[in-house]
Regions:
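N-terminal subdomain of nucleotide-sugar transferases
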Residues: 1-45, 50-52, 80
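Conserved donor-binding/catalytic core segment of Leloir-type glycosyltransferases
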Residues: 4-6, 215-240, 253
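Membrane-proximal helix-turn-helix segments that form the acceptor-binding/catalytic region
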Residues: 70-78, 94, 98-102, 109, ...
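Acidic donor-binding loop of glycosyltransferase active sites
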Residues: 164, 276, 292-310, 325-326
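Carbohydrate-associated surface elements
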Residues: 172, 194
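A short, well-ordered alpha-helix in the C-terminal region of glycosyltransferases
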Residues: 249, 355, 362, 369-383, ...
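Nucleotide-activated donor-binding/catalytic signature segment of Leloir-type glycosyltransferases, i.e.
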Residues: 255, 262-290, 294-297
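Conserved acidic donor-binding segment of nucleotide-sugar-dependent glycosyltransferases
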Residues: 341-342, 346-353, 362-368
């Protein structure tokens, strides 16, 4: 099968979920004897795979990259045909549906969330909600803001309508597409995210701590991911004083960056515990397993907003488990049920610092329980959530959408 990924596959310098997803899916689809074409700003990206053809997009400003991308993609699609065009971007899906149907046998669209929900949550957390409310109440600026939102929804609806197959990463997203966008259920298949079980694997904890310059005796609690509003990291900060009252030497590793970082640092200062937190900022993807393996317990304290509506299939959960670590996470669809099925951790009510602190403390207190849950986590992810198994499902869906 000859596939073209319409989204730019950026160099994997960062531990960013969207970038990781693209790299892992592309590389594993190539292992299945598919010919994969990608656009990238770094010609070395995935070029070591025999079945991946890299099409270089000259970097620069956002406007420059966008212009170069459209020129490169128009030239490629104009000169070659493909079995499948694949995208996670509604704009690309919309344009492909309008202009590229004669150049492919199937158009496949993947959805990892509800874009307007994520956008609204980020704006509300960054203090823009009041401004948006004013715009909605009247005036020309309110009119254009509303028009922009309607246009985004229209583009997404068209992209979904043009698609031959749609992949949703959670059952909640599928249900939302059926009810809010009137997409037929038989057009949508749920395929969860996964973990790179070759990269994310158990490593010696002491060696990892030495590598990172961490204390060898203190217990460490780890969070990995984008510091976005829906991650709920503020509840881990709020839980920390209770944990520290029982385990004064405990430390907290916050691995990643995002719009909430400064707020989280300020919150730790308010509690007088900023010296117990390590905010690493951006970390290369291949270094993330070192931080996870240096830790005793890993966390995913997701909030209800956005997450309860669509459920979750979080990379961090599978990566924690692939490293053989016990997990404390919010009881949200896709997370709590994975912990229940695997017996690899404890689920707690979302947005509840007390329950979060109690569960983390329970694991810190019991080394045998941590070891048992970690072992079960590893087995569960290896059997069910490797990126290779995800790619096999995507491969089957794409081939089923091809029209001869």
């Amino acid at each position: 099968m000859k596939m073209l990924f319409l989204d730019i596959v950026w160099p994997l310098y960062l531990a960013d979920g969207s970038l990781i997803h693209r790299h892992e899916l592309v590389s594993n689809l190539a292992k299945l004897e598919n010919e994969i074409h990608i656009f990238t700003t770094d010609s070395s990206t995935l070029s070591h795979f025999d079945n991946i053809r890299c099409h270089y997009v000259h970097p620069g400003s956002l406007l420059t990259i966008t212009s170069n991308y459209f020129r490169s993609s128009a030239r490629l699609i104009g000169s070659e045909t493909f079995d499948v065009l694949y995208t996670r971007n509604p704009n690309f899906g919309f344009l492909a549906g309008l202009f590229c149907r004669s150049r492919c046998k199937a158009l496949v669209y993947e959805l990892n969330g509800i874009p307007e929900d994520e956008s609204n949550l980020i704006k509300s957390k960054s203090g823009e909600e009041k401004t948006l409310q004013k715009r909605r109440t009247g005036g020309i600026s309110g009119y254009f803001s509303s028009a922009k939102s309607r246009l985004k929804i229209l583009v997404l609806k068209k992209a979904l309508g043009f698609s031959d197959k749609i992949i949703a990463v959670t059952p909640g997203i599928k249900a939302n597409l059926e009810s809010a966008y009137q997409i037929p259920g038989d057009k949508i298949t749920v395929v969860p995210n996964g973990a790179n079980t070759s990269l994310f694997r158990p490593l010696d904890q002491e060696e990892c701590r030495k590598n990172l310059g961490l204390d060898l005796k203190s217990p460490y609690i780890c969070f990995v991911g984008n510091l976005a509003p829906w991650q709920g990291v503020e509840y881990l900060v709020k839980a920390a004083p209770s944990i520290l009252s029982r385990y004064p030497d405990c430390r907290f590793l916050i691995v990643g960056d995002g719009v909430m970082k400064n707020e989280l640092i300020s919150l730790s200062r308010e509690f007088g515990i900023e010296n117990r937190f390590v905010f690493t900022g951006v970390v290369p993807y291949d270094r993330v397993p070192v931080y996870i393996n240096a830790s005793n317990v890993c966390t995913a304290p997701f909030i209800l907003a956005r997450n309860a509506k669509i459920g979750l299939s979080p990379l961090k959960l599978y990566e924690y488990m692939a490293c053989g670590k016990p997990v404390v996470a919010s009881a949200i669809n896709g997370v709590g049920d994975a912990l229940e099925a695997s017996k690899g951790g404890l689920s707690v009510p979302p947005e509840n610092p007390g329950a979060l602190a109690e569960a983390i403390s329970e694991l810190l207190e019991n080394q045998d329980l941590r070891a048992s849950m970690g072992s079960k986590s590893l087995s569960y992810v290896t059997e069910n959530y490797s990126w290779y198994s995800v790619a096999k499902q995507v491969d089957k869906i794409c081939k089923s959408g091809i029209k001869n």
